Every structure is written in structure tokens, then in C-alpha cells.
Amino acid sequence: MKSLDIYTDGACSGNPGAGGYGAVLLYKGSRKEISQGFRRTTNNRMEMLAVIKALECLKEPCNVTLYSDSKYVVDSITKGWVYGWKKRGWIKSDKKKALNVDLWERLLPLLEKHNVEFIWVKGHADNVENERCDELARGAIAAGSLLEDEGAE
């Protein structure tokens, strides 16, 4: 199975507001960068979409080390919260409805396809690839051509 590193980030101008995601995929000296902006969304949705879109780039099952500065994404997966929410019909332990269910339903099958290790990195702390993802996400917002985030609540 191929092994690669993925770095992801999401950004939002206002929350909700215009948002974007950026991702960098690194495999044996090769590099792929992806990004997109959206009209009205949230920072957490952009963080999730960065992970989803990066994993969707992979054409076969892979071992992935995924670096994200999103505690929401990393903790939801590594601490198992999302699996509990799904088991309870997308209800959190505090009895409130889980957010971003449409994106979790896209992400979970990708996590079954690939062997993904999530690693949290501190944002804006001189991690070169995380900073590049932030540039991509912010650049996608600034570039215009913003898409509609259909699942934004």
C-alpha cells in the first residue's frame, strides 16, 4: 500500500461567511495542491472539506498521515466522538444534533477505504506545509468564483 502525507486547512472570513480549504498531498517527492472557495460556510466545514477532497484525490487505498490544525476534525476522529454520534443517529452526548452530518457521511467511508493517522499540528506555528494550506485556503476565498456550500446550515 502506498504511503503519503497530507496537510489540510480551512479558513473562513466571518463564521459563517466566505470560506475556503487548502490541501497539500506529498508522495515520494511529488506534490499536489488543491483548494476551493465557498460563498457562505463555516471554518469547521472548510476544515472537513479539505480532508475529504484530499482523500478523494487518492485513486487506490493508501496509508495516510494527515496533518490538520483543526481540533474539531482531529478530536472527533481520534477520540471516537463521530462514531458515537453516528451510532446515536447523529445526536451528541449532550443530546444536541451533531453538526456537519453531510460531511461526516462523506468522510467516514473514506476513512474505511484508507488507513489514516490523524496528527494535530498547531496552526500558525511555522509548520511550512500547514502555512501553505492556509495560504491556499485564504487564496481561494480571495480569488472569487466562490461555490455554494449546499450543506451549510
Where are these regions (language model features)?
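RNase H-like nuclease fold core
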Residues: 1-45, 49, 53-62, 77, ...
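RNase H catalytic domain
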Residues: 8-18, 52-132, 136, 141
